Every structure is written in structure tokens, then in C-alpha cells.
Design a protein with these regions (language model features):
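Middle-to-C-terminal accessory/interaction subdomains
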Residues: 1-199
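Secondary-structure capping and domain/repeat boundary segments
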Residues: 185-233
């Protein structure tokens, strides 16, 4: 607990035990969806059997998210600050539950990787259009069965339209607020568009993204180096 994660040796040591990218993706997901039945609850780790298997987080039980428990106000909650709270209550974010994330953020490599992967998500699955379209697709696929649920569980199912709209509002507005919280927490500035182009014979990988087309544009911070790789066919 006294190790300084800014020390490369300490960070390398813990990186041998946990899958760092998995830990980053897990925290980004929980923070973005505003799951407030976490991080002091619903936590599980797993690892592959055999030597060298690193511990990974498991994402599950996320129904305390997307604004549903908070009557539609979740999209403007600063869940990043919530996830690093040093003196939280016994539930849902006590100090022990935020400790690992807080310590890892002491390391500049982890910080930069966290910020860049968050930007990757802002540029892809966390766009408002993507989330609203996904929501509408799911809602449409089950809307015909809703009357059956309303007949069987009238008290819980009659608010179908209201709750779908809560999730739609969250999908529409969350990225705007979450980007502001990210910028404030890490003192980020100079968000800019970055264009990437590949020639026939290969693809490019930007951080965690491999675009399907040979041209792609995303938004990143000029003060955080990004990782670009050429991948031959």
C-alpha cells in the first residue's frame, strides 16, 4: 500500500499480476455508464489457469446505471471523481474499493493509456448516435412483448416508455459531460481532430482501434501521445 506507482519498478511489478488494459477498459465502462452500485459491490476477478495468467475484472450486474435509479439525472454525475474517492461511505465507494484505481493513476503511463482508451471509446461506441441507435434497436426488438409484462407485472412494467426515455437521454448527453469531467480531472486541453489514412496492403491501429476503412478521423488531446501502428495484410 506504500508503493509509489509513479516508480516504474513498482508499476511493472503490479502489471505482472493484473491485465492493465482489461483494468482500464473495465473502469472506463463502469465510470461511463455511471454504475453507482460499485466499486464497493459487484466485484469479481478471474484469471486464466497456468503460469503467467493475469487477473482480470469481470463486468456484471450493471442495472444501477444509465440513469435509471436516479430518475434520469445520471448523465451529469461525475463518476470519475466518485471512483477515486478516498473517504467514501461503506457503500457504494468505500476507500478500499477505490484504492487500486487511485494508486494506478499515480503512474503516467497508466494515466495516458486510460485517457487514450477513453478517447477511443468516445470516438466509437460512446458516440451519442451509436448508443441511441443501439438502444432503439434493442427497444424495437422487445416492444411487442411489453404488453405481456405489463399485464403480469403492472407496477414495474407500466413505466416502459418513461424508462426507455431515461436511457435515451443518458445516451444522448453522457459523452458531453463525461468528457468535461475527464478534462477537469487530468487538466487536459487542446482537443483536436486527428486524421489517419492507410494505403493498400495494410491497416492502421490507433491505440485500440483498427478502422474498417482506409481513412478515419477521431478526436484526441495534443498533450497525450497516441500510439499508431501499421499492420500489414
Amino acid at each position: 500500500s506504500q508503493s509509489n506507482m509513479a516508480d516504474p519498478a513498482a508499476y511493472d511489478s503490479i502489471s505482472k499480476w493484473i491485465d492493465v488494459d482489461n483494468h482500464i477498459n473495465y473502469n472506463i465502462a463502469q465510470i461511463f455508464i455511471d454504475n453507482r452500485d460499485w466499486p464497493g459491490n459487484n466485484i469479481k476477478f478471474w484469471r486464466p489457469q497456468g503460469n503467467g495468467g493475469k487477473r482480470r475484472r469481470m463486468l456484471y450486474d450493471t442495472d444501477f446505471s444509465f440513469g435509471i435509479p436516479w430518475m434520469g439525472l445520471g448523465y451529469n454525475f461525475n463518476t470519475l471523481q466518485f471512483a477515486v474517492e478516498e473517504n467514501g461511505p461503506d457503500w457504494p465507494n468505500p476507500p478500499w474499493s477505490t484504492f487500486l484505481f487511485r494508486k494506478l493513476l499515480e503512474n503516467s503511463n497508466y494515466q495516458q493509456r486510460f485517457i487514450n482508451i477513453f478517447c477511443d471509446r468516445f470516438n466509437t461506441i460512446f458516440t451519442s448516435d451509436n448508443m441511441v441507435n443501439r438502444l432503439d434497436s434493442i427497444a424495437t426488438s422487445i416492444v411487442d412483448i411489453i404488453p405481456v409484462h405489463q399485464n403480469k407485472w403492472p407496477q414495474s412494467a407500466n413505466n416502459w416508455d418513461y424508462n426507455v426515455q431515461i436511457v435515451r437521454d443518458f445516451a444522448q448527453f453522457r459523452s458531453e459531460y463525461m468528457r468535461e469531467y475527464l478534462e477537469s480531472f487530468f487538466n487536459l486541453s487542446n482537443l483536436t481532430e486527428a486524421g489517419f489514412y492507410s494505403t493498400p496492403g495494410g491497416k492502421i491501429k490507433i491505440n485500440t482501434i483498427v478502422p474498417e476503412s482506409n481513412s478515419w478521423i477521431g478526436e484526441y488531446y495534443t498533450d497525450i501521445p497516441i500510439r499508431v501502428e501499421a499492420i500489414p495484410d
